[in-house]
Amino acid sequence: MKKLSFILLLSFIGIYMNAQEHLLPVDKKAKETFYDKEIKRLLIPDDTEFGMICKPSFEFESSLTYDSEAHALIYTEADTSIWSRTFEASHRLERKGESVFMWKSQQITFYRVPGTKMYMLPISDEMAQSLKRLWKVAINQAEFPEKERTKMKTEDGKVITVEIEEIVLDGTGWEYFFKGKRAKIQGDDKGGKGKVGSLINLTIELRNAVRENDSQKCAALQSQIDSLYKEFK
């Protein structure tokens, strides 16, 4: 078999969310982990109709959800890393040599449950319906993109076409959900370009308004919500 050698150029390494027009589908068949269960239990309150879960690489997890009973947006943030706490409880460090240790999964033992803080801001039914409509269309349009290709030379001088893998170095995970459907994107915490970038930016502004208990700032986002819905539609 002939070896293929090539140089990975920095231009090939892209943050996937940049100029992204669609969210990515979430695998419904994927096994639910202890971490997934704790994210739901700690960050998705009862009576949640739709929402978003934010999973940063170097900060603590949070969520923005809509409570259909309270007619309010709820922002919930963990006071420590849920991922770190669940990993600590479900793994143990095992010696594999004189100076080599490896993490091995185990049954849940001692678990230090993360704390959470919750903020609530009532919104109009009009805004709730607009957000619901936006969430639904954005999630329903989730799709995997076509991979980009480039030409490269093998060691014997032949030119071949290879697929460029999109690589995300850490970043923030954003997962949107509505009535059992979920879609996600991995990128940074500043939104980005394209429709998905605008959706992230809107989510951040809504989150800030709830955290600051600023009804006026939240209401001012109505036109932005309607405009973004038209873009997705």
What is each stretch, according to the model?
Residues 1-25:
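Bacterial Sec-dependent N-terminal signal peptides
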Residues 20-233:
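Function-determining sites in protein domains
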